[in-house]
Structures are given as structure tokens and as C-alpha cells.
């Protein structure tokens, strides 16, 4: 079991903890598939709703909040039945807008894993307005059921009435619908190719600034992040922040980053290079490789 879970595992009922420990191996990064979840429910003799709420301390253990020191965990349950944990991330010494909220982390985890719809969001603190707006960008966002400890469950539409969303800006295919944009680039570099693929899957209906970041660690492992825009603009999730959240969930340190690549479209209304460099330089003393590509 990873050291970061030692404290949180003691907060779980013993039958659930005993069943969960084998899953918390060195490669565990917050994903539990539908079959594993069913086995946890059976072994613990708890309901699924009780298990998901009980797992929140495990999700919160993925957090990295050096500024607030407030650990928030979130669990997104997909239509597939799989669950995806996420946690808040803050960049030391940097402006607060670089922060990743736990709900954003969990949703990006699900998106990068190929999930097509979120049906439940379990979180240990009431979602802030920023996160409510971010969730509203998703497929059937208003119908996502929000679960909080010691509170009744409600749909997102209860927490965000009279919502402003993608349809107000004539966007009919929201976040989590598979979007593919093709770009022209001749490269044999696997890391650049990976970034190009993820840029093509990014979500930028308001600026067409399709973009992705890939980080490589000293052992050659890679961690990606895609741009995810929002109808309200400010809650958009930048690809570097998503990549750093991804890396953190995998229990890697920022000091292990040895290479960073940003690929973005030449036809976008904005460029993400400045914000991407700011975030990177807050955590790693390396230069950003910036590649601009033309849509096919």
C-alpha cells in the first residue's frame, strides 16, 4: 500500500478497509472499475452509496494543497459504473487561478480514461460555484447527482439553478462527447505524437484553441492533460494543470519532471503558452517545448 493512504485507511470501516487495501498498490491512481466496486460493496456489507462516501478520505489523500492545507477529495462515477477519484492541487507560490479543484480533477481523470458521461459526483465538501459551473459543461450536466456526507443528495440543477451553459453559446456537443480534430505534423517523437493525439481530443468550442500537454518523468513515464473550455470561460481547465493533476494522482513528484511539451492549434483565438510556462516554472526548472500545428 502507498504511504499516502496509511492515515486515511484507518478512517474506513474495517471490512471495507480490508477489502480495499489490495487495490492500493504502487500503481493505484484513483480508478476503481465497476466490478471492483461491486466487490467492495459485497465485502463491506454496505450499500454502494455508503461505500462511495466512505472512500472520500482515500480520494482526499491524493490532494496536494500547500497553500490552503485543505484536503478535498472527489469521486466521479461514470455511466460505465467505474469510479474516478480526484483531489485539489495548488501550485506553491503561484496565483490561485492555477489551482485545480477536486471535482475538476475527478472529471478530468474520467475524461482521460474515456468515460462518456458522469452520473454521480461524491465530494467531501459542498461544490463551490466554480465547480458547479465546470460540471454544468458536461453531458447532461444538470442531471449529475451530487452526494455529500450527512446531507441529502440533489441534482446539480438544484445547486446551480437558472444555469448558463454550452447551449447558451450554441454549443450542442458538450464536454465528454468525443471530439476529434486532426492536425498536420510530421514527427517521430513519441511524446510529441502523444501530445498531438490529445490536442485532437481536447475541448475548445469557444476559441478553437485545441491544445494538450504531455509531461515526461525521469523514468520515461508520461502524463497528459487536455484543454477543457467552459461556457463561463474562467472555469476552463488548462492542459498543464490537468497534466500536473494527473501526475500527482499517480504519486509522482514535480521534481521528477524532465520534459514538457505543449501542442496547440495555429487557428485558435488565444494561445495557452504563457499560462502553461508559468505553471511549469512554478514546479520544475525545465523549458517548455511549444509546438504550433495546423488543422487538416
Swiss-Prot record:
Q: What is its EC number?
A: 3.5.4.5
Q: Where is the active site?
A: 103 (proton donor)
**Would the keyword Metal-binding be found if you checked this record's keyword annotation?**
yes
At the top of the EC hierarchy, this enzyme's class is hydrolase
Note one Pfam family from the annotation: dCMP_cyt_deam_2
The cofactor remark states: Binds 1 zinc ion.
* Keyword field: Hydrolase, Metal-binding, Zinc
- What is one GO biological process annotated to this record? cytidine deamination
Query: Which reaction is this enzyme known to catalyze?
Result: cytidine + H2O + H(+) = uridine + NH4(+); 2'-deoxycytidine + H2O + H(+) = 2'-deoxyuridine + NH4(+)
Its cellular-component GO annotations read:
cytosol
Q: Keyword Hydrolase: yes or no?
A: yes
> GO terms for molecular function, please?
cytidine deaminase activity; identical protein binding; zinc ion binding
Q: Locate the CMP/dCMP-type deaminase domain: which residues?
A: 47-167, 186-296
Tell me which residues bind Zn(2+).
Answer: 101, 128, 131
| Cofactor(s), by name | Zn(2+)
Q: Tell me where on the tree of life, at the top rank, the source sits.
A: Bacteria
HAMAP family in the record? Cyt_deam (MF_01558)
Subunit description: Homodimer.
Query: What family is it from?
Result: Belongs to the cytidine and deoxycytidylate deaminase family.
Q: What does this protein do?
A: This enzyme scavenges exogenous and endogenous cytidine and 2'-deoxycytidine for UMP synthesis.
Name of the protein in its database record = Cytidine deaminase
Q: Per the UniProt entry, what species is this protein from, by scientific name?
A: Shewanella sp. (strain MR-4)
Amino acid at each position: 500500500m502507498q504511504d499516502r493512504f496509511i492515515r486515511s485507511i484507518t478512517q474506513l470501516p474495517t471490512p471495507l478497509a480490508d477489502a480495499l487495501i489490495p487495490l492500493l498498490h504502487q500503481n493505484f491512481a484513483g480508478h476503481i472499475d465497476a466490478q471492483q466496486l461491486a466487490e467492495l460493496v459485497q465485502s463491506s456489507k454496505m450499500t454502494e452509496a455508503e461505500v462511495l462516501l466512505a472512500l472520500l478520505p482515500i480520494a482526499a489523500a491524493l490532494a496536494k494543497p500547500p497553500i490552503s492545507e485543505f484536503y478535498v477529495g472527489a469521486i466521479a462515477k461514470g455511466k460505465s459504473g467505474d469510479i474516478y477519484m480526484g483531489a485539489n492541487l495548488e501550485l506553491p507560490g503561484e496565483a490561485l487561478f492555477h489551482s485545480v479543484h477536486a471535482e475538476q480533477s475527478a472529471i478530468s481523470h474520467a475524461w482521460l480514461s474515456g468515460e462518456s458521461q458522469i452520473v454521480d459526483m461524491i465530494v467531501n465538501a459542498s461544490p463551490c460555484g466554480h465547480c458547479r459551473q465546470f460540471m454544468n459543461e458536461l453531458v447532461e450536466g444538470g442531471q449529475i447527482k451530487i452526494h455529500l456526507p450527512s446531507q441529502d443528495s440533489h441534482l446539480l440543477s438544484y445547486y446551480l439553478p437558472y444555469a448558463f451553459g454550452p447551449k447558451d453559446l450554441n454549443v450542442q456537443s458538450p464536454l465528454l462527447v468525443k471530439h476529434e480534430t486532426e492536425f498536420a505534423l510530421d514527427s517521430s517523437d513519441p511524446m510529441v505524437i502523444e501530445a498531438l493525439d490529445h490536442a485532437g481530443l481536447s475541448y475548445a468550442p469557444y476559441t478553437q484553441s485545441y491544445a494538450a500537454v504531455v509531461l515526461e518523468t525521469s523514468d520515461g513515464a508520461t502524463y497528459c492533460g487536455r484543454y477543457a473550455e467552459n461556457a463561463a470561460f474562467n472555469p476552463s481547465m488548462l492542459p498543464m494543470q490537468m497534466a500536473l493533476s494527473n501526475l500527482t494522482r499517480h504519486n509522482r513528484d514535480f521534481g521528477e519532471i524532465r520534459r514538457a511539451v505543449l501542442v496547440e492549434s495555429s487557428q485558435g483565438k488565444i494561445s495557452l503558452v504563457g499560462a502553461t510556462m508559468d505553471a511549469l516554472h512554478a514546479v520544475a526548472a525545465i523549458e517548455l517545448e511549444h509546438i504550433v500545428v495546423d488543422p487538416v
